[in-house]
């Protein structure tokens, strides 16, 4: 089951009603998204062995909040959505959509915001990025989108991705279309941009009990039914793992068919869980899953595999 973005003027009234029943997509709600993430990261940093890094990630998330409002994006995506719909592609496909200079403008603004807060190696990294040429930055962005993580040092990747993510989230927030569910493949990827999820969440409120995967780039969430592998869509060999007990707010769903796992966060167990923050703060669970022989099917925007310089 895949999800395709349908332009507003191509939706009939019956399709609009169907889409309203179970929203296949939840476009990013940028108001307070980054502040909420930063607050959750700081909260989780208390008594966590990764506390220093969680506080570092909180600084980046807060900077994203500031830059979001200082550098708004104005863009008409109507033509792009129509073209992508005709091609059956995500409208903001990371492998197709040309990047304009706005994302590098966001990166420089993030660096300016973060500089007073950084010291030591972290400060050296952002100063290095500040001096990089336009082409060098584009090459790093292309490498990350191609999953060529060895070409971008793991200390630079979070800053590059923070700017790219903010840019893509701004674009996703402007999409003037609706979405509907269609049978197809590759629902393990974001239907808006084609990137990977960071984690999934069983929500409360108007989407009570529904599971949504959260994009690690454009911040869109998309519906995937529960008790089905989000990576291969099989359901016969799923297992659920937690570090605490069966009522834990964070679990890992593993699949013996494809050998991967993805974390599930349960808002009903802990209303404050946040897709990126709680995933990052629970790396002990990742270590356990690796010991069990499973590979992670997602990437956290603050923790990329790569080669340090």
Curated annotation (Swiss-Prot):
Its main location: cytoplasm. GO terms for biological process: protein maturation. InterPro entries: FdhE-like_sf (IPR024064), FdhE_C (IPR056796), FdhE_central (IPR056797), FdhE_N (IPR056774), Formate_DH_accessory (IPR006452). Gene3D superfamilies: FdhE-like domain. GO terms for molecular function: ferric iron binding. It is found in: Cytoplasm. One of its GO terms (cellular component) is cytosol. HAMAP family: FdeH. Belongs to the FdhE family. Necessary for formate dehydrogenase activity. NCBIfam families: FdhE (TIGR01562), PRK03564.1 (NF002925). This is Protein FdhE. It comes from Escherichia coli O139:H28 (strain E24377A / ETEC).
């Amino acid at each position: 089951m895949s999800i395709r973005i349908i332009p507003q003027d191509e939706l009939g009234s019956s399709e609009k009603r169907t889409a309203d029943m179970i929203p296949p997509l939840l476009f990013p709600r940028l108001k307070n998204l980054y502040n909420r993430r930063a607050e959750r990261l700081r909260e989780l940093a208390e008594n966590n062995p990764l506390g220093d890094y969680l506080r570092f990630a909180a600084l980046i998330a807060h900077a994203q909040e500031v830059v979001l409002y200082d550098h708004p994006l104005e863009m008409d995506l109507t033509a792009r959505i129509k073209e992508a719909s005709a091609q059956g592609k995500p409208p903001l496909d990371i492998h197709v959509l040309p990047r304009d200079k706005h994302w590098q403008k966001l990166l420089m603004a993030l660096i300016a915001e973060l500089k007073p807060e950084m010291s030591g190696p972290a400060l050296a990294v952002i100063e290095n990025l500040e001096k990089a040429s336009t082409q060098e930055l584009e090459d790093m962005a292309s490498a990350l989108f191609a999953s060529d993580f060895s070409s971008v040092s793991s200390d630079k990747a979070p800053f590059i991705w923070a700017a790219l993510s903010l840019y893509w989230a701004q674009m996703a927030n402007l999409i003037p279309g609706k979405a509907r569910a269609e049978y197809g493949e590759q629902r393990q990827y974001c239907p808006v941009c084609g990137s990977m999820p960071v984690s999934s969440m069983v929500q409360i409120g108007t989407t009570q009990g529904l599971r949504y995967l959260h994009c690690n780039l454009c911040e869109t969430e998309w519906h995937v039914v529960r008790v089905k592998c989000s990576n291969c869509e099989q359901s016969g060999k799923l297992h659920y793992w937690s570090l605490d007990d069966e009522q834990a707010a964070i679990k890992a769903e593993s699949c013996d068919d494809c050998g991967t796992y993805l974390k599930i966060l349960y808002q009903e167990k802990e209303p404050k869980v946040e897709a990126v923050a709680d995933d990052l703060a629970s790396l002990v669970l990742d270590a356990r899953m690796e010991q069990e022989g499973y590979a992670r099917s997602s990437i956290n925007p603050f923790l990329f595999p790569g080669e340090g310089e």
